[in-house]
């Protein structure tokens, strides 16, 4: 006798069940949220020269802003927020996170000094830390094992969609900003 766990395959009738339309709709909303998440993360790299000029900061500060100010707080809060996603309402948690990072992104636009921009980017990191733990858990609930990897891959496409869109949006912002404030 062994203590190995035997995994039973899904019954044939369960394996052939279609995924509810709501699951696909919800996945598309999650992809949109993840896309916005990465637009927000990447757009600062396009705006770097203008931020340096407007706030009088150097490359070291921008490195701190992109790395430490955002990433440390994203990582620090990701673990407890992931645990909270396991025990609380995941959609509500993601909504609160999206609200926080959206507010902090808007607050970034009003920053008149490096300290204010740093606080805003920390807030963005904390808010964005709610997204993936909540999304992975929700996707696991909404999609059966036979299609879950596909659903997760679709969700992950938001990284690349957001990264690409951020370049276009950032370029438009820089052009318009420089025309308005030569």
Predicted regions and their residues:
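Helix-breaking motifs and short loop linkers at transmembrane-helix boundaries and internal kinks
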Residues: 56, 89, 110-116, 127, ...
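Extracellular/periplasmic helix-loop-helix junction of adjacent transmembrane segments
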Residues: 47-76
């Amino acid at each position: 006798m062994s203590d190995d766990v035997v995994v039973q395959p899904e019954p044939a009738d369960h394996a052939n069940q279609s995924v509810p339309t709501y699951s696909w709709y919800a996945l598309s909303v999650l992809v949109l949220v993840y896309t916005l998440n990465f637009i927000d993360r990447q757009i600062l790299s396009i705006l770097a020269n203008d931020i340096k000029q407007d706030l009088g900061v150097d490359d070291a500060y921008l490195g701190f802003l992109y790395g430490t100010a955002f990433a440390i707080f994203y990582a620090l809060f990701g673990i407890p927020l992931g645990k909270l996603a396991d025990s609380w309402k995941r959609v509500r948690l993601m909504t609160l996170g999206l609200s926080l990072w959206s507010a902090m992104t808007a607050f970034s636009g009003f920053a008149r000094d490096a300290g204010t921009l740093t606080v805003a980017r920390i807030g963005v990191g904390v808010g964005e830390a709610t997204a993936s733990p909540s999304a992975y858990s929700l996707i696991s609930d909404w999609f059966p094992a036979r299609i879950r990897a596909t659903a997760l891959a679709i969700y992950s496409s938001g990284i690349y969609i957001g990264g690409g869109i951020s370049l276009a949006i950032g370029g438009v912002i820089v052009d318009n900003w420089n025309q308005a404030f030569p």
